Amino acid sequence: MRRRRGSDSAAYEARTRDIVVRVFPTYAAEESSPEQGLYLWSYTVEIENHGEETVTLIARRWTITDGFNRVNEVEGSGVVGEQPELKPREAFRYVSNCPLPTPSGAMRGSYQMVTDAGDLFDVAIPEFSLHLPGAAMKLN
């Protein structure tokens, strides 16, 4: 995993085989209600195929940990209602969100991919921090 700093959010990066996954989390203050225990995080994911074969993202698995170290596992088909196909040197980008009951947490996971030849493999999604600036960090 590699972490890069951007102008207003950090970028987290992981590479599995020839697939690069970058995540850019941001706090959605206007959609959050801290007084009701709702902290909404938006995250943009970029998936790049640097390989020589076409791959299709068929499933996702997330591990979400809140500030009290409670873990929630989420699995499903594709991402944002799609099973994107990435040809060599193509990329796919999507935006999703994650509500937390605490001002800090973390997410990590994996995508299941399949090649045109039918080979299945998992691609790591880098662990990334969901931490409201100024909030006490309870993870780690």
Swiss-Prot record:
It comes from the Bacteria. Pfam families: DUF525. InterPro entries: ApaG_domain (IPR007474), ApaG_sf (IPR036767), Uncharacterised_ApaG (IPR023065). Residues 13-137 form the ApaG domain. GO terms for biological process: error-free translesion synthesis. This is Protein ApaG. The gene is apaG.
